[in-house]
């Protein structure tokens, strides 16, 4: 979507998976709607939600809340109406862009995350392929950007890294187009042969490649 850095291996795996759509008789293009301003708009709306739900908790139990969450809540408390209106305008404009996109396209496809799975001991990702992340949620910004579209989305596995870690794509359908989206996702998953495959071998804990 051109909004955050993408790990080279993830981009390669997802790009290779697009060949399966071509094999299914689908024309694949590099066309993408304009997502300018979407991340900042989402961050503003998210912060307002955090402040709405958690400001009382922050007052009572600040020491028990992670610093990143405190930052979200405090940001939300500082956001004014003008910023909320601006974020909502971005959301509305994006929805219109998606409708225009779907006049000539059936689906929008992109990676499910910017990086492969990282160690459970690691709280969050601070850089992607050497490029620093602006926030602690940048590594999955490509998912919440699609939340802003108000379109149906499904995530489907599409391959594995060299170390056996799973990688997936998100398929976005036109609203309301859940039935067509699920059919396309099922056909894609079957074409990859991953429908019944375990990402991790339960006997040895190693990835299946």
Enumerate the predicted regions with their spans:
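Flexible, acidic loop-helix segments that line cofactor/substrate-binding pockets
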Residues: 1-4, 31-43, 67-79
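Structural helix-boundary/capping segments
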Residues: 3-4, 11-24, 79, 84-86, ...
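Short glycine/threonine-rich loop-to-helix capping motif typified by GTGT followed
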Residues: 8-11, 39-49, 119-125
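A generic structural motif
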Residues: 25-29
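Tryptophan-centric aromatic hotspots in well-structured domains and transmembrane helices
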Residues: 35, 42, 71, 95, ...
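Short helix-loop capping/hinge segments that flank enzyme active sites or metal/cofactor-binding pockets
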Residues: 47-99, 111, 115-116, 120, ...
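Short, surface-exposed loop/helix-turn segments at secondary-structure junctions
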Residues: 86, 118-139
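Short, Asp-centered acidic motifs that coordinate Mg2+ and/or phosphate
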Residues: 106-108
